[in-house]
């Protein structure tokens, strides 16, 4: 799953500070500068509660002062007073109106911004207003209105990109707009032009339109807008985040990018930049090192608070670790902060999913996807929840919806393949091939590919794939002996992978090697019943009955009702008894089986007992099965017959 939050305020507001000739991307909005001739201070007669009068002065300095101390309501009131002073001017200063809109952007008054710009059709007059109009509509989640904005005539032509999916004005409307532009002075229009170039508003506008197309699931139009924005400015930070969030990069290019970034991260050890920390956490998450991911996100949250772009990665990490308590606390914080976005409810759904309350998880994940139908992570989680409710068709529908939202992501194809693996190996391999083509170096995907091959009984192929995953996880070369690889530290998440390699080695007759993998998995997870029972089976085949019995006892102590383990133990006991020749043993004539075995308290269904704290002990081989007692009784019966015949023979000899 991706780590960038879908609910952050993901539009890029360019900075209004003086940037000069720097090519650094603008990612935040500074407080707007102003000239002394504009927004002159206004004194208004006001009264106190006691009835005394005083003059309240509204000025830009007062607005800045209120913003600095966080009193946004007073800042809005003073800004409105200043704007009201220029409304009745015969020749309005359009630059002053733009500065007022910038103040409203800082204050996040999106509805008022849309109204003021639409009132004078300013978005059709200049690119500055077009950008702010698109941003306001986007923040109000009016994505169709953003796509319908007629701003194509304001964009510079670029023959390399081709026609843009942006509306333009008709011929009649175009003449009307030109007449409106003539109402404003040339100096004002030139000042707005300089401001838009300095702030790079044209690429910022196209990125906002592109993200609106993505919300409308029109990825082709979005890519055209993004390519146009990159042709004008290829240093925009938001483009990188947008393409990573919606998986817009081709798999080969993305793998090259990740390889370069992984090398660069090695140069930033000890760096506390949140971007560096998030990339390190994402890298650890992809490699299955979830405890390391949690440690990095803990550091990030401690230094910078709950960073919005890291929240979804932390949710996924806590879910994989099954840290339900931390998920519950994080969900409460997110819901109390902003319950009107899907991310808090996604966290709540993951909490119920982690504790096994699938019905409640289904309710909250449904609410999450209804609030934002383009939330791909929500659809993937919805598919997981439906899978555990044994609704496979609906689960695959959710994965299909996610694949349409992020068609270059591997996860929807991976989980669809796993759904088909139970009844259609052909379709399973097809979708698994799609997932591998999109992320060939993802160890989780290669592990599931190996599992599909194992299910199809292609053990040689599965063995190669599992070992490839082992080398990926340990970050070692394939020429290193497997004994040295197993000495490296491996995250506990990968203990099923080691168990699977042991299964293949056991099936191919390499029993000692299989025991080595099982022992590594047991050290990572001491109560891993499958590995313990498999170790016992290997020892049984090797003829080490004592060791096999010991490990079978351990397995049944953890899971006493496991019928498979009980059957394996029973077959081992039967095989060991068949190899023991009873006829070669001499028993006393008056042998009484109850005398020798009654004191051991034989239980016919011993596995029904509840396990005690000191472990559950399986009865010994001699006293655990009824067929052996039958063999002893037959032997005693034959001995009695022989003793009965001996006196007759002695009498004949005497005669």
Swiss-Prot record:
> Its pathway?
Protein modification; protein ubiquitination
What residue intervals traverse the membrane? none
Q: Does the keyword Transport apply?
A: yes
Per its UniProt record, what InterPro entries does this chain match?
TPR-like_helical_dom_sf (IPR011990), TPR_rpt (IPR019734)
Q: What does UniProt note about where in the body, tissue by tissue, this protein is expressed?
A: Expressed in GABA motor neurons.
Quote any Pfam family the record assigns: TPR_19
GO cellular component terms, alphabetically, are:
anaphase-promoting complex; anchoring junction; cytoplasm; synapse
State the compartments where it is located.
Cell junction; Synapse
Broad class of the protein's primary localization: other
UniProt entry keywords in alphabetical sequence:
Cell cycle, Cell division, Cell junction, Developmental protein, Meiosis, Mitosis, Neurotransmitter transport, Repeat, Synapse, TPR repeat, Transport, Ubl conjugation pathway
- The answer to whether the entry has keyword Nucleotidyltransferase is no
What does the sequence similarity comment in the record state about its family? Belongs to the APC6/CDC16 family.
Task: Report the protein's function.
Answer: Probable component of the anaphase promoting complex/cyclosome (APC/C), a cell cycle-regulated E3 ubiquitin ligase that controls progression through mitosis and the G1 phase of the cell cycle. The APC/C complex acts by mediating ubiquitination and subsequent degradation of target proteins. Developmental role in early embryogenesis and the metaphase to anaphase transition in oocyte and spermatocyte meiosis and mitosis in germ cells. Required for embryonic anterior-posterior axis formation.
Q: What is this protein called?
A: Cell division cycle protein 16 homolog
Q: Which organism is it from?
A: Caenorhabditis elegans
Gene giving rise to this polypeptide: emb-27
